[in-house]
UniProtKB/Swiss-Prot annotation:
Keywords: Amidation, Ion channel impairing toxin, Neurotoxin, Secreted, Signal, Toxin, Voltage-gated sodium channel impairing toxin. Expressed by the venom gland. Residues 1-23 form the signal peptide. This is Myrmicitoxin(1)-Pm3a. Negative results: does not exhibit hemolytic and cytotoxic activities on HEK293 cells. One of its GO terms (cellular component) is extracellular region. GO terms for molecular function: sodium channel regulator activity; toxin activity. Residues 24-59 form a propeptide. It is found in: Secreted. Belongs to the formicidae venom clade 1 family. Toxin that causes a slowly developing temporary paralysis when intrathoracically injected into insects (blowflies). Does not cause spontaneous nocifensive behaviors by intraplantar injection in mice. It comes from Pogonomyrmex maricopa.
């Protein structure tokens, strides 16, 4: 079965547009002087939120986060245990 060239072009265009959209605010801090400070504040807030979530007494939440963020480990464990 042959995949149409238009599908390849669409996938590449969507991938590039998504990566450019995500990278634009951080790509050129000279264009927006507050972009670097905003990115640093966002990174610090994210780090604090992760630290607070991991410090909670419920041990299931970090395990659930691990399974959600790294699905191949979940698949491996389910294959071995199941």
């Amino acid at each position: 079965m042959e995949i149409p060239k238009l599908l390849y072009i669409a996938v590449i265009a969507i991938g590039l547009s998504g990566s450019l959209t995500c990278a634009t605010p951080l790509a050129n801090p000279l264009a927006d002087p507050e972009a670097e400070a905003e990115a640093k504040a966002t990174a610090e807030a994210t780090a604090e939120a992760i630290a607070e979530a991991l410090a909670e007494p419920e041990p299931g939440l970090p395990i659930l986060a691990l399974f959600v963020t790294i699905p191949f480990i979940h698949h491996y464990l389910m294959e071995k245990l199941g």
